[in-house]
UniProtKB/Swiss-Prot annotation:
GO molecular function: diacylglycerol O-acyltransferase activity; long-chain-alcohol O-fatty-acyltransferase activity
The keyword Transmembrane belongs to this UniProt entry's keyword annotation: yes
Extracellular side: 214-486
Catalyzed reactions per annotation: an acyl-CoA + a 1,2-diacyl-sn-glycerol = a triacyl-sn-glycerol + CoA; a long chain fatty alcohol + a fatty acyl-CoA = a wax ester + CoA
Membrane topology: Single-pass membrane protein
Main location: membrane
Protein family per UniProt: In the N-terminal section; belongs to the long-chain O-acyltransferase family.
Record localization: Cell membrane; Endoplasmic reticulum membrane
Protein name: Wax ester synthase/diacylglycerol acyltransferase 11
Task of the protein: Bifunctional wax ester synthase/diacylglycerol acyltransferase. Involved in cuticular wax biosynthesis. Required for petals development, probably by mediating the production of fatty acids at the plasma membrane in the petal epidermis acting as lubricants that makes petal elongation smooth in narrow space between the sepals and the anthers inside floral buds.
Amino acid sequence: MGEDKKTARETVEEEPLSPCSRLFNSPDFNCAIIVTMGSKVKGDTPAIIHGLEHTLVNHPRFSSILEMNNGKKPRWVRTKVKVEEHVIVPDVDPDIENPDQYLEDYISKLTTIPMDLSKPLWEMHLLGVKTSNAESYAILKIHHSLGDGMSLMSLLLACTRKTSDPEALPTVAVHKKRFGPSCNSGFFNKIWWLFVGLWFILRLLFNTFVDILMFALTIFVLRDTETPLLAKPGSELIPKRFVHRIISFDDVKLVKNAMKMTVNDVLLGVTQAGLSRYLSRKYDQEATPKSKESMRRIRLRSAIMINLRPNAGIEALADMMAKKSKCRWGNLFGYILLPFSVGLETDPLEYVRQAKATIDRKKHSLEAVFSMAFFKLILKVLGLKASVVLVRKVIHSTTLSFSNVVGPKEEITFHGHPLNYISPCVFGHPHALTLHFQTYANKVIISVTADPTVIPDPHKMCDDLVESLKMIKAAVLERGLYEIEV
Protein backbone atom coordinates (compact mmCIF):
# COMPACT_ATOMS: atom_id res chain seq x y z
CA MET A 1 0.00 0.00 0.00
CA GLY A 2 2.85 2.38 0.90
CA GLU A 3 4.56 1.68 -2.43
CA ASP A 4 1.30 2.39 -4.29
CA LYS A 5 0.95 5.77 -2.59
CA LYS A 6 4.55 6.60 -3.38
CA THR A 7 4.08 5.66 -7.01
CA ALA A 8 0.91 7.72 -7.26
CA ARG A 9 2.66 10.71 -5.72
CA GLU A 10 5.56 10.44 -8.16
CA THR A 11 3.11 10.20 -11.06
CA VAL A 12 1.51 13.45 -9.97
CA GLU A 13 4.79 15.24 -9.28
CA GLU A 14 6.69 14.11 -12.36
CA GLU A 15 5.72 14.18 -16.01
CA PRO A 16 7.85 13.51 -19.09
CA LEU A 17 8.29 16.23 -21.69
CA SER A 18 6.20 15.95 -24.81
CA PRO A 19 8.10 15.47 -28.10
CA CYS A 20 7.51 19.12 -29.05
CA SER A 21 8.71 20.35 -25.64
CA ARG A 22 11.86 18.26 -26.06
CA LEU A 23 12.40 19.98 -29.39
CA PHE A 24 12.18 23.43 -27.79
CA ASN A 25 14.69 22.39 -25.13
CA SER A 26 17.34 21.20 -27.57
CA PRO A 27 20.49 23.38 -27.71
CA ASP A 28 19.98 24.04 -31.43
CA PHE A 29 16.34 25.10 -31.11
CA ASN A 30 16.07 26.84 -27.75
CA CYS A 31 12.97 29.03 -28.08
CA ALA A 32 11.29 31.39 -25.63
CA ILE A 33 8.26 33.67 -25.69
CA ILE A 34 8.15 37.27 -24.47
CA VAL A 35 4.84 39.00 -23.74
CA THR A 36 4.99 42.75 -23.16
CA MET A 37 2.04 44.25 -21.28
CA GLY A 38 1.77 48.03 -21.23
CA SER A 39 -0.16 49.34 -18.22
CA LYS A 40 -2.21 52.53 -18.00
CA VAL A 41 -1.10 53.09 -14.39
CA LYS A 42 2.16 52.98 -12.46
CA GLY A 43 3.33 49.54 -11.46
CA ASP A 44 2.47 48.03 -8.07
CA THR A 45 5.00 45.24 -7.49
CA PRO A 46 3.45 43.75 -4.30
CA ALA A 47 0.02 43.56 -5.99
CA ILE A 48 1.45 41.69 -8.98
CA ILE A 49 3.42 39.27 -6.79
CA HIS A 50 0.31 38.59 -4.70
CA GLY A 51 -1.73 38.01 -7.86
CA LEU A 52 0.82 35.62 -9.36
CA GLU A 53 0.85 33.59 -6.14
CA HIS A 54 -2.87 32.89 -6.55
CA THR A 55 -2.93 32.33 -10.31
CA LEU A 56 0.08 31.56 -12.49
CA VAL A 57 2.11 29.48 -10.02
CA ASN A 58 -0.85 27.15 -9.51
CA HIS A 59 -0.36 25.91 -13.06
CA PRO A 60 1.76 22.71 -13.06
CA ARG A 61 4.16 23.96 -15.75
CA PHE A 62 4.82 27.19 -13.89
CA SER A 63 5.58 25.33 -10.67
CA SER A 64 7.81 22.61 -12.14
CA ILE A 65 11.52 22.51 -12.85
CA LEU A 66 13.04 20.78 -15.84
CA GLU A 67 15.01 17.75 -14.66
CA MET A 68 17.57 16.48 -17.15
CA ASN A 69 19.38 13.57 -15.48
CA ASN A 70 21.99 11.67 -17.43
CA GLY A 71 20.55 8.58 -19.06
CA LYS A 72 16.94 9.61 -18.47
CA LYS A 73 14.44 11.49 -20.57
CA PRO A 74 13.78 15.09 -19.44
CA ARG A 75 10.90 15.40 -17.00
CA TRP A 76 8.83 18.09 -15.32
CA VAL A 77 9.19 17.84 -11.53
CA ARG A 78 6.89 19.83 -9.23
CA THR A 79 8.57 22.18 -6.80
CA LYS A 80 7.66 24.94 -4.36
CA VAL A 81 7.78 28.31 -6.09
CA LYS A 82 8.97 31.54 -4.52
CA VAL A 83 7.37 34.16 -6.72
CA GLU A 84 9.82 36.83 -5.56
CA GLU A 85 12.62 34.87 -7.25
CA HIS A 86 10.81 35.11 -10.58
CA VAL A 87 9.91 38.81 -10.43
CA ILE A 88 12.69 41.18 -11.47
CA VAL A 89 12.42 44.93 -10.86
CA PRO A 90 15.37 46.82 -12.37
CA ASP A 91 16.33 50.32 -11.25
CA VAL A 92 15.19 52.75 -13.93
CA ASP A 93 15.91 56.47 -14.01
CA PRO A 94 12.45 58.13 -14.03
CA ASP A 95 13.91 60.96 -16.13
CA ILE A 96 15.47 58.67 -18.72
CA GLU A 97 16.03 60.54 -21.98
CA ASN A 98 14.47 58.05 -24.42
CA PRO A 99 12.16 55.62 -22.57
CA ASP A 100 10.85 53.98 -25.76
CA GLN A 101 14.38 53.10 -26.85
CA TYR A 102 15.20 51.91 -23.33
CA LEU A 103 12.25 49.49 -23.46
CA GLU A 104 13.36 48.11 -26.84
CA ASP A 105 16.94 47.69 -25.62
CA TYR A 106 15.81 45.99 -22.41
CA ILE A 107 13.66 43.44 -24.23
CA SER A 108 16.42 42.82 -26.76
CA LYS A 109 18.86 42.12 -23.93
CA LEU A 110 16.48 39.49 -22.53
CA THR A 111 17.13 37.39 -25.64
CA THR A 112 20.79 37.05 -24.64
CA ILE A 113 20.14 35.79 -21.09
CA PRO A 114 19.46 32.02 -20.80
CA MET A 115 16.72 30.74 -18.52
CA ASP A 116 17.75 29.47 -15.07
CA LEU A 117 17.16 25.69 -15.14
CA SER A 118 17.21 25.49 -11.34
CA LYS A 119 13.79 27.22 -11.26
CA PRO A 120 10.55 26.93 -13.22
CA LEU A 121 11.20 28.35 -16.69
CA TRP A 122 9.48 31.71 -16.45
CA GLU A 123 10.19 35.19 -15.13
CA MET A 124 8.45 38.56 -15.03
CA HIS A 125 10.22 41.90 -15.37
CA LEU A 126 8.47 44.98 -13.97
CA LEU A 127 9.63 48.26 -15.50
CA GLY A 128 8.56 51.55 -13.96
CA VAL A 129 9.24 53.46 -17.15
CA LYS A 130 6.72 55.72 -18.86
CA THR A 131 6.73 55.52 -22.66
CA SER A 132 4.56 56.91 -25.42
CA ASN A 133 2.22 53.92 -25.04
CA ALA A 134 2.10 53.07 -21.32
CA GLU A 135 2.82 54.25 -17.78
CA SER A 136 4.62 51.05 -16.75
CA TYR A 137 5.36 47.57 -18.06
CA ALA A 138 5.17 43.91 -17.09
CA ILE A 139 7.31 41.72 -19.37
CA LEU A 140 6.71 37.98 -19.10
CA LYS A 141 9.47 35.69 -20.41
CA ILE A 142 8.46 32.04 -20.81
CA HIS A 143 10.38 29.12 -22.22
CA HIS A 144 8.54 27.69 -25.21
CA SER A 145 8.71 24.16 -23.77
CA LEU A 146 6.02 25.21 -21.26
CA GLY A 147 3.40 25.38 -23.99
CA ASP A 148 2.41 26.70 -27.40
CA GLY A 149 1.64 30.36 -27.99
CA MET A 150 -2.15 30.03 -28.04
CA SER A 151 -2.26 28.03 -24.79
CA LEU A 152 0.12 30.41 -23.02
CA MET A 153 -1.87 33.44 -24.16
CA SER A 154 -5.09 31.80 -22.90
CA LEU A 155 -3.38 31.10 -19.59
CA LEU A 156 -2.24 34.71 -19.31
CA LEU A 157 -5.75 35.97 -20.07
CA ALA A 158 -7.10 33.61 -17.39
CA CYS A 159 -4.99 35.63 -14.92
CA THR A 160 -6.78 38.85 -15.95
CA ARG A 161 -10.24 40.31 -15.47
CA LYS A 162 -12.42 42.75 -17.38
CA THR A 163 -11.65 46.35 -16.51
CA SER A 164 -15.39 47.06 -16.52
CA ASP A 165 -16.12 44.08 -14.24
CA PRO A 166 -13.26 43.07 -11.88
CA GLU A 167 -14.89 39.69 -11.19
CA ALA A 168 -15.45 38.65 -14.81
CA LEU A 169 -13.03 36.81 -17.08
CA PRO A 170 -12.26 38.31 -20.51
CA THR A 171 -14.34 37.24 -23.47
CA VAL A 172 -12.59 36.04 -26.62
CA ALA A 173 -14.27 35.71 -30.01
CA VAL A 174 -14.77 32.10 -31.09
CA HIS A 175 -15.35 31.28 -34.75
CA LYS A 176 -17.98 28.59 -35.06
CA LYS A 177 -18.05 26.49 -38.20
CA ARG A 178 -21.06 24.74 -39.64
CA PHE A 179 -20.83 22.15 -42.35
CA GLY A 180 -23.50 19.86 -43.70
CA PRO A 181 -27.28 19.90 -44.01
CA SER A 182 -29.65 20.47 -41.13
CA CYS A 183 -32.00 17.79 -39.84
CA ASN A 184 -34.91 19.44 -41.66
CA SER A 185 -33.21 19.50 -45.08
CA GLY A 186 -35.07 17.93 -47.98
CA PHE A 187 -33.99 14.83 -49.93
CA PHE A 188 -32.45 16.73 -52.86
CA ASN A 189 -30.66 19.06 -50.48
CA LYS A 190 -29.09 16.06 -48.74
CA ILE A 191 -28.03 14.61 -52.11
CA TRP A 192 -26.43 17.95 -52.93
CA TRP A 193 -24.52 17.91 -49.65
CA LEU A 194 -23.37 14.37 -50.42
CA PHE A 195 -21.74 15.56 -53.65
CA VAL A 196 -20.27 18.55 -51.81
CA GLY A 197 -18.81 16.20 -49.22
CA LEU A 198 -17.25 13.95 -51.87
CA TRP A 199 -15.76 16.97 -53.64
CA PHE A 200 -14.41 18.22 -50.31
CA ILE A 201 -12.68 14.87 -49.65
CA LEU A 202 -11.15 14.71 -53.15
CA ARG A 203 -9.86 18.27 -52.87
CA LEU A 204 -8.53 17.57 -49.37
CA LEU A 205 -6.59 14.53 -50.60
CA PHE A 206 -5.18 16.35 -53.63
CA ASN A 207 -4.11 19.45 -51.66
CA THR A 208 -2.56 17.30 -48.95
CA PHE A 209 -0.57 15.32 -51.54
CA VAL A 210 0.76 18.52 -53.14
CA ASP A 211 1.63 20.05 -49.76
CA ILE A 212 3.41 16.89 -48.60
CA LEU A 213 5.43 16.92 -51.82
CA MET A 214 6.37 20.59 -51.34
CA PHE A 215 7.22 19.91 -47.69
CA ALA A 216 9.55 17.07 -48.72
CA LEU A 217 11.19 19.21 -51.41
CA THR A 218 11.70 21.98 -48.84
CA ILE A 219 13.51 19.59 -46.52
CA PHE A 220 15.91 18.45 -49.24
CA VAL A 221 16.33 21.02 -52.03
CA LEU A 222 13.73 23.81 -52.17
CA ARG A 223 14.75 27.10 -50.52
CA ASP A 224 13.24 30.57 -50.60
CA THR A 225 14.73 33.17 -52.92
CA GLU A 226 17.65 35.16 -51.53
CA THR A 227 16.14 38.48 -50.42
CA PRO A 228 16.96 41.19 -47.84
CA LEU A 229 14.66 39.27 -45.45
CA LEU A 230 16.21 35.79 -45.60
CA ALA A 231 18.15 34.74 -42.49
CA LYS A 232 21.87 34.10 -42.45
CA PRO A 233 23.43 31.05 -40.76
CA GLY A 234 23.44 31.53 -36.98
CA SER A 235 20.63 34.09 -37.02
CA GLU A 236 19.00 32.41 -34.01
CA LEU A 237 22.03 33.40 -31.90
CA ILE A 238 21.84 37.12 -32.74
CA PRO A 239 20.11 39.38 -30.15
CA LYS A 240 16.77 40.29 -31.70
CA ARG A 241 15.10 43.69 -31.93
CA PHE A 242 11.43 43.94 -30.96
CA VAL A 243 9.28 46.79 -32.24
CA HIS A 244 5.53 47.23 -32.50
CA ARG A 245 2.78 49.45 -33.82
CA ILE A 246 -0.84 49.78 -32.73
CA ILE A 247 -3.54 50.01 -35.40
CA SER A 248 -7.32 50.22 -35.25
CA PHE A 249 -9.20 46.93 -35.17
CA ASP A 250 -12.19 48.81 -36.60
CA ASP A 251 -10.15 49.51 -39.75
CA VAL A 252 -9.36 45.81 -40.11
CA LYS A 253 -13.02 44.87 -39.60
CA LEU A 254 -14.10 47.50 -42.12
CA VAL A 255 -12.01 45.79 -44.82
CA LYS A 256 -13.11 42.35 -43.59
CA ASN A 257 -16.81 43.18 -43.84
CA ALA A 258 -16.48 45.00 -47.15
CA MET A 259 -14.68 42.11 -48.84
CA LYS A 260 -16.59 39.38 -46.98
CA MET A 261 -13.44 37.81 -45.59
CA THR A 262 -11.95 36.92 -42.22
CA VAL A 263 -9.70 39.01 -40.01
CA ASN A 264 -6.87 36.59 -40.76
CA ASP A 265 -7.38 37.11 -44.52
CA VAL A 266 -7.06 40.87 -44.10
CA LEU A 267 -3.98 40.67 -41.86
CA LEU A 268 -2.23 38.34 -44.28
CA GLY A 269 -3.13 40.69 -47.13
CA VAL A 270 -1.68 43.59 -45.15
CA THR A 271 1.46 41.51 -44.57
CA GLN A 272 1.85 40.78 -48.29
CA ALA A 273 1.45 44.47 -49.10
CA GLY A 274 3.88 45.51 -46.35
CA LEU A 275 6.56 43.03 -47.41
CA SER A 276 6.17 44.14 -51.03
CA ARG A 277 6.65 47.80 -50.06
CA TYR A 278 9.66 46.99 -47.92
CA LEU A 279 11.40 44.85 -50.55
CA SER A 280 10.64 47.35 -53.31
CA ARG A 281 12.30 50.13 -51.33
CA LYS A 282 15.28 47.91 -50.53
CA TYR A 283 15.82 47.07 -54.19
CA ASP A 284 15.55 50.77 -55.09
CA GLN A 285 18.20 51.63 -52.51
CA GLU A 286 20.49 48.92 -53.82
CA ALA A 287 20.03 50.23 -57.37
CA THR A 288 19.09 46.82 -58.74
CA PRO A 289 16.05 47.49 -60.94
CA LYS A 290 16.31 44.01 -62.41
CA SER A 291 15.65 42.51 -58.98
CA LYS A 292 12.68 44.82 -58.51
CA GLU A 293 11.22 43.82 -61.88
CA SER A 294 11.52 40.16 -60.95
CA MET A 295 9.84 40.55 -57.54
CA ARG A 296 6.86 38.50 -58.69
CA ARG A 297 9.15 35.53 -59.25
CA ILE A 298 10.40 35.64 -55.68
CA ARG A 299 9.66 32.54 -53.61
CA LEU A 300 8.87 33.84 -50.12
CA ARG A 301 7.17 31.58 -47.59
CA SER A 302 6.27 31.53 -43.95
CA ALA A 303 6.61 28.49 -41.72
CA ILE A 304 3.48 28.76 -39.59
CA MET A 305 3.07 26.70 -36.45
CA ILE A 306 -0.46 25.27 -36.16
CA ASN A 307 -1.69 24.16 -32.75
CA LEU A 308 -3.31 20.72 -33.11
CA ARG A 309 -4.45 20.43 -29.49
CA PRO A 310 -7.91 21.85 -28.70
CA ASN A 311 -7.51 24.99 -26.61
CA ALA A 312 -8.51 24.45 -22.99
CA GLY A 313 -10.30 27.80 -22.84
CA ILE A 314 -9.91 30.71 -20.45
CA GLU A 315 -12.63 29.50 -18.06
CA ALA A 316 -11.09 26.03 -17.69
CA LEU A 317 -7.62 27.49 -17.09
CA ALA A 318 -8.92 29.98 -14.52
CA ASP A 319 -10.76 27.18 -12.72
CA MET A 320 -7.63 25.02 -12.80
CA MET A 321 -5.52 27.75 -11.19
CA ALA A 322 -8.16 28.57 -8.59
CA LYS A 323 -8.86 24.95 -7.57
CA LYS A 324 -5.51 23.41 -8.60
CA SER A 325 -7.40 20.95 -10.77
CA LYS A 326 -6.19 19.34 -14.00
CA CYS A 327 -6.53 20.64 -17.52
CA ARG A 328 -5.25 19.49 -20.92
CA TRP A 329 -1.94 21.15 -21.67
CA GLY A 330 1.21 20.84 -23.72
CA ASN A 331 2.89 21.48 -27.06
CA LEU A 332 1.21 19.66 -29.94
CA PHE A 333 1.71 21.39 -33.25
CA GLY A 334 2.43 20.94 -36.92
CA TYR A 335 3.81 23.26 -39.56
CA ILE A 336 2.32 24.59 -42.76
CA LEU A 337 4.33 26.39 -45.43
CA LEU A 338 2.38 29.47 -46.51
CA PRO A 339 3.55 31.22 -49.72
CA PHE A 340 3.35 35.01 -49.95
CA SER A 341 2.77 36.82 -53.24
CA VAL A 342 5.33 39.61 -53.51
CA GLY A 343 5.01 42.48 -55.97
CA LEU A 344 3.65 46.02 -56.25
CA GLU A 345 -0.06 45.88 -57.16
CA THR A 346 -1.94 48.74 -58.82
CA ASP A 347 -5.06 47.55 -56.98
CA PRO A 348 -4.35 47.40 -53.20
CA LEU A 349 -7.29 45.03 -52.68
CA GLU A 350 -5.49 42.42 -54.78
CA TYR A 351 -3.18 41.73 -51.83
CA VAL A 352 -6.16 40.67 -49.71
CA ARG A 353 -7.74 38.62 -52.50
CA GLN A 354 -4.50 36.72 -53.04
CA ALA A 355 -4.14 36.11 -49.31
CA LYS A 356 -7.68 34.74 -49.06
CA ALA A 357 -7.15 32.38 -52.00
CA THR A 358 -3.95 31.04 -50.41
CA ILE A 359 -5.51 30.58 -46.97
CA ASP A 360 -8.67 28.95 -48.32
CA ARG A 361 -6.56 26.37 -50.11
CA LYS A 362 -4.48 25.66 -46.99
CA LYS A 363 -7.67 25.13 -44.98
CA HIS A 364 -8.41 22.16 -47.25
CA SER A 365 -5.18 20.31 -46.51
CA LEU A 366 -3.82 18.02 -43.78
CA GLU A 367 -0.30 19.43 -44.11
CA ALA A 368 -0.06 20.37 -40.41
CA VAL A 369 -1.21 16.91 -39.27
CA PHE A 370 1.26 15.23 -41.63
CA SER A 371 4.20 17.39 -40.53
CA MET A 372 3.45 16.64 -36.86
CA ALA A 373 3.18 12.89 -37.53
CA PHE A 374 6.38 12.93 -39.60
CA PHE A 375 8.25 14.78 -36.86
CA LYS A 376 7.10 12.29 -34.21
CA LEU A 377 8.09 9.37 -36.45
CA ILE A 378 11.59 10.79 -36.99
CA LEU A 379 11.90 11.43 -33.26
CA LYS A 380 10.92 7.86 -32.44
CA VAL A 381 13.07 6.18 -35.10
CA LEU A 382 16.12 8.45 -35.40
CA GLY A 383 16.06 10.42 -32.15
CA LEU A 384 15.90 14.06 -31.05
CA LYS A 385 18.95 15.29 -32.98
CA ALA A 386 17.50 14.13 -36.29
CA SER A 387 14.17 15.79 -35.46
CA VAL A 388 15.89 19.08 -34.65
CA VAL A 389 17.81 18.93 -37.94
CA LEU A 390 14.51 18.35 -39.77
CA VAL A 391 12.71 21.32 -38.18
CA ARG A 392 15.72 23.62 -38.57
CA LYS A 393 15.98 22.66 -42.23
CA VAL A 394 12.36 23.61 -42.85
CA ILE A 395 12.76 26.96 -41.08
CA HIS A 396 16.12 27.69 -42.73
CA SER A 397 14.51 27.14 -46.12
CA THR A 398 11.71 29.67 -45.48
CA THR A 399 11.80 33.41 -44.87
CA LEU A 400 9.64 34.27 -41.87
CA SER A 401 7.36 33.15 -39.06
CA PHE A 402 3.81 34.51 -38.83
CA SER A 403 1.04 34.30 -36.25
CA ASN A 404 -2.27 35.94 -35.49
CA VAL A 405 -3.51 35.59 -31.91
CA VAL A 406 -7.08 36.47 -30.95
CA GLY A 407 -7.20 38.52 -27.76
CA PRO A 408 -9.98 39.78 -25.48
CA LYS A 409 -12.87 41.78 -26.88
CA GLU A 410 -12.68 44.33 -24.09
CA GLU A 411 -9.96 46.04 -22.08
CA ILE A 412 -8.59 43.92 -19.24
CA THR A 413 -6.80 44.37 -15.93
CA PHE A 414 -3.74 42.39 -14.89
CA HIS A 415 -3.69 42.16 -11.08
CA GLY A 416 -4.94 45.70 -10.62
CA HIS A 417 -3.22 47.16 -13.69
CA PRO A 418 -5.51 48.14 -16.61
CA LEU A 419 -3.65 47.30 -19.82
CA ASN A 420 -3.26 49.56 -22.82
CA TYR A 421 -1.82 46.85 -25.06
CA ILE A 422 -0.37 43.32 -25.19
CA SER A 423 2.50 42.43 -27.52
CA PRO A 424 3.76 38.82 -27.81
CA CYS A 425 6.90 37.69 -29.64
CA VAL A 426 9.12 34.63 -29.88
CA PHE A 427 12.86 34.15 -30.40
CA GLY A 428 15.40 31.34 -30.62
CA HIS A 429 14.38 29.96 -34.03
CA PRO A 430 16.52 30.53 -37.15
CA HIS A 431 14.34 33.16 -38.85
CA ALA A 432 15.47 36.76 -39.30
CA LEU A 433 11.86 38.00 -39.31
CA THR A 434 8.86 37.07 -37.19
CA LEU A 435 5.51 38.85 -37.42
CA HIS A 436 2.83 38.64 -34.74
CA PHE A 437 -0.63 40.22 -34.87
CA GLN A 438 -2.41 40.44 -31.51
CA THR A 439 -5.98 41.71 -31.22
CA TYR A 440 -6.89 43.54 -28.02
CA ALA A 441 -10.24 45.33 -27.52
CA ASN A 442 -10.47 47.79 -30.45
CA LYS A 443 -6.77 47.52 -31.32
CA VAL A 444 -4.45 45.28 -33.29
CA ILE A 445 -0.85 45.21 -32.14
CA ILE A 446 1.69 44.49 -34.87
CA SER A 447 4.88 43.02 -33.39
CA VAL A 448 8.03 42.68 -35.49
CA THR A 449 10.93 40.55 -34.26
CA ALA A 450 14.01 41.10 -36.41
CA ASP A 451 17.63 40.09 -36.67
CA PRO A 452 19.31 43.54 -36.96
CA THR A 453 22.18 42.12 -39.02
CA VAL A 454 19.64 41.19 -41.72
CA ILE A 455 16.87 43.75 -41.12
CA PRO A 456 18.53 46.87 -39.65
CA ASP A 457 15.36 48.97 -39.93
CA PRO A 458 12.48 47.04 -38.27
CA HIS A 459 10.68 50.33 -37.55
CA LYS A 460 10.34 50.89 -41.29
CA MET A 461 8.95 47.38 -41.63
CA CYS A 462 6.28 48.31 -39.06
CA ASP A 463 5.55 51.56 -40.89
CA ASP A 464 5.12 49.68 -44.18
CA LEU A 465 2.57 47.36 -42.57
CA VAL A 466 0.64 50.30 -41.09
CA GLU A 467 0.68 52.18 -44.41
CA SER A 468 -0.47 49.07 -46.23
CA LEU A 469 -3.60 48.84 -44.09
CA LYS A 470 -4.31 52.53 -44.71
CA MET A 471 -3.89 51.97 -48.45
CA ILE A 472 -6.24 48.97 -48.46
CA LYS A 473 -8.83 50.78 -46.33
CA ALA A 474 -8.68 53.83 -48.62
CA ALA A 475 -9.33 51.60 -51.65
CA VAL A 476 -12.39 50.11 -49.93
CA LEU A 477 -13.82 53.54 -49.08
CA GLU A 478 -12.99 55.00 -52.49
CA ARG A 479 -14.99 52.29 -54.26
CA GLY A 480 -17.90 52.51 -51.86
CA LEU A 481 -17.63 48.85 -50.91
CA TYR A 482 -18.39 49.61 -47.29
CA GLU A 483 -21.74 50.91 -46.13
CA ILE A 484 -21.78 52.75 -42.82
CA GLU A 485 -24.23 51.12 -40.44
CA VAL A 486 -26.72 53.50 -38.84
